[in-house]
């Protein structure tokens, strides 16, 4: 991937956490050390005023954060609560300049068939697309690995994730493709994404084993990221890993490895 096209998004839940307690200072550090963007998970537990000021002060992009509430979308009973919360998340995304929200599917529910849960997901995401229409904000559903980090999670297949978001027929609904989770599940990027790069709204990377910085494990991250870029992905690369080295050094090394 050419350095000119590379935009690295530091997940400040983990990056710069050892260097700064508050998220505003982590934003400043990410900017100072060359990241083009930042991202985080939940927004309702953060000092949004200080984060907004740090984003304005540095000019760094906020690439994404998690849509709240984080409840099981596999349960139709949660639909109204999620959609109500989504409206607040969209307002916050527009305030902070983020164009992508991340959705978690939730756990595989006992007593409910997989098809029933999938139908609930599609129904809720379709309604979410209607809320997002015209807002400039999109929602990415994230498949996660169920072998190490998220045992019991419903959506562990990228192919199934793409099937679900395509079933909504909503252009505002896509996936977040996490290369680490995909690799843990034994997936090949080219095989599982195929001709659906338009449905990939955001990507995350980390190495395996350990979920640490690129170069610490065995995943051929450059090959996978290059394939995504060559097939049309032009968004930020989310650095969602637990750094073993200093965060600033891992950003520089990731840029070198991917470039």
Name the predicted role of every residue range.
Residues 39-57, 105, 112-113, 148-149, ...:
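Glycine-rich, proline-tolerant flexible connector loops at the mouths of alpha/beta enzymes
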Residues 57, 76-174, 184:
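Active-site acidic/histidine proton-transfer and metal-coordination neighborhood
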Residues 27-44, 66-71:
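N-terminal substrate-binding region of glycoside hydrolase catalytic domains
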Residues 1-34, 97-99, 123, 155-177, ...:
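Histidine-acidic metal/acid-base catalytic patches
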Residues 52-80:
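Short hydrophobic interaction/assembly module
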Residues 39, 64-66, 102, 140, ...:
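Conserved beta-strand positions in the central sheet of alpha/beta enzyme cores
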Residues 50-58, 127-132, 195, 223-227:
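Catalytic-core regions built around general acid/base machinery
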Residues 14-16, 42-44, 68-71, 107-109, ...:
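Active-site-proximal loop/turn and secondary-structure-junction residues that shape catalytic pockets
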